[in-house]
């Protein structure tokens, strides 16, 4: 009896309730069996109906009695105590539903983040190795003379060499017109016309690309005094995004020891916009998303993506 009080359940009433459930099921089964058999053969139809109704009422009353008995016993059973220790079985209700657990999406996001981190770490490692920033502490301690500061030679390349590099790049891409201007002396400004899609103004310092402005093919690229406008943005959001992506590409294509390779790689990437409005997104397969074409081009594969689909 002490166990019964500790648990909070009347085990005797619980046993009687189980017997009452069995009795209720039996009485309900008798009702359906009686209905299945139908009226028994009697002398007259009237006598058969009276006997059928009488027996049917008796069966229903039996079901009602068993149901009332079960309800009475259910009030005597009681409820389990809330403070009763369930040990590890009490943690079963805390398990999440498998269908509602976003495990796959979280793992996929973590994989993308890890892949992107590894990619950028590789780029950073290659750039640091190119800069030759490693110095030995012993060399710095034993050397009494300071090393002479090395002046970057690539910033003062001959203009003829720069012109030859730009000319070779122009011959590589017949569908891309490159015009070279020198409005401020030695610094070059390139006017790149890509088919009938866009025009890009590339401001350079020797063979280093300083900035890029992309505008539509029919947009004005000159100021009032007929000079190239290297500051104003495009009036169209699509070309504004291409300008932003071009700035990102300048940060990606960095190779100080071979600036001609950087310019050629950037021009190859820029030429991939020749079908800006004709190439669908490689992720969603749509030509337009929120009214914009896929303005992003992958730096390695040159595949087209919408700005939101590339994430």
Curated annotation (Swiss-Prot):
Pfam family, one: Med27
GO molecular function: transcription coactivator activity
Protein's cellular compartments: Nucleus
GO terms classed as biological process: camera-type eye development; regulation of transcription by RNA polymerase II; retinal cone cell development
Primary subcellular site in the record, as a coarse category: nucleus
InterPro entries: Mediator_Med27 (IPR021627)
GO cellular-component term (any): mediator complex
Keywords associated with the record: Activator, Developmental protein, Nucleus, Transcription, Transcription regulation
Family of the protein in this entry: Belongs to the Mediator complex subunit 27 family.
Biological function: Component of the Mediator complex, a coactivator involved in the regulated transcription of nearly all RNA polymerase II-dependent genes. Mediator functions as a bridge to convey information from gene-specific regulatory proteins to the basal RNA polymerase II transcription machinery. Mediator is recruited to promoters by direct interactions with regulatory proteins and serves as a scaffold for the assembly of a functional preinitiation complex with RNA polymerase II and the general transcription factors. Required for the development of dopaminergic amacrine cells in the retina.
PANTHER family per record: 34 KDA TRANSCRIPTIONAL CO-ACTIVATOR-RELATED (PTHR13130), MEDIATOR OF RNA POLYMERASE II TRANSCRIPTION SUBUNIT 27 (PTHR13130:SF4)
Subunit composition and interactions: Component of the Mediator complex.
Protein name: Mediator of RNA polymerase II transcription subunit 27
Organism: Danio rerio (Zebrafish)
Chain's gene name: med27
């Amino acid at each position: 009896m002490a166990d019964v009080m500790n648990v909070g359940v009347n085990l005797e009433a619980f046993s009687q309730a189980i017997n009452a459930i069995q009795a209720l099921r039996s009485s309900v089964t008798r009702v359906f069996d009686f209905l299945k058999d139908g009226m028994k053969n009697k002398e007259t139809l009237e006598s058969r109906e009276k006997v059928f109704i009488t027996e049917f009422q008796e069966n229903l009353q039996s079901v009602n009695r068993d149901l009332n008995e079960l309800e009475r016993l259910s009030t005597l059973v009681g409820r389990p105590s809330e403070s009763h220790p369930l040990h590890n079985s009490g943690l079963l209700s805390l398990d999440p539903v498998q269908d509602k657990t976003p495990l796959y999406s979280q793992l996929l996001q973590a994989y993308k983040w890890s892949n992107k981190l590894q990619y950028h770490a590789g780029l950073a490692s290659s750039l640091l190795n190119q800069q030759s920033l490693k110095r030995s502490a012993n060399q710095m301690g034993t050397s009494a003379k300071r090393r002479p500061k090395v002046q970057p030679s690539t910033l003062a390349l001959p203009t003829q060499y720069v012109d030859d590099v730009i000319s070779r790049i122009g011959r590589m891409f017949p569908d891309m017109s490159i015009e070279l201007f020198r409005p401020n002396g030695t610094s070059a400004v390139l006017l790149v016309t890509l088919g009938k899609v866009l025009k890009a103004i590339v401001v350079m310092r020797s063979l280093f690309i300083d900035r890029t402005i992309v505008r539509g093919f029919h947009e004005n690229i000159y100021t009032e005094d007929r000079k190239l406008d290297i500051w104003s943005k495009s009036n169209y959001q699509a070309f504004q995004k291409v300008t932003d992506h071009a700035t990102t590409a300048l940060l990606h294509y960095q190779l100080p020891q071979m600036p001609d390779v950087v310019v050629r790689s950037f021009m190859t990437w820029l030429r991939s916009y020749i079908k800006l409005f004709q190439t669908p997104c490689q992720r969603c397969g749509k030509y337009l998303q929120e009214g914009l074409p896929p303005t992003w081009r992958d730096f390695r594969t040159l595949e087209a993506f919408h700005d939101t689909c590339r994430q």
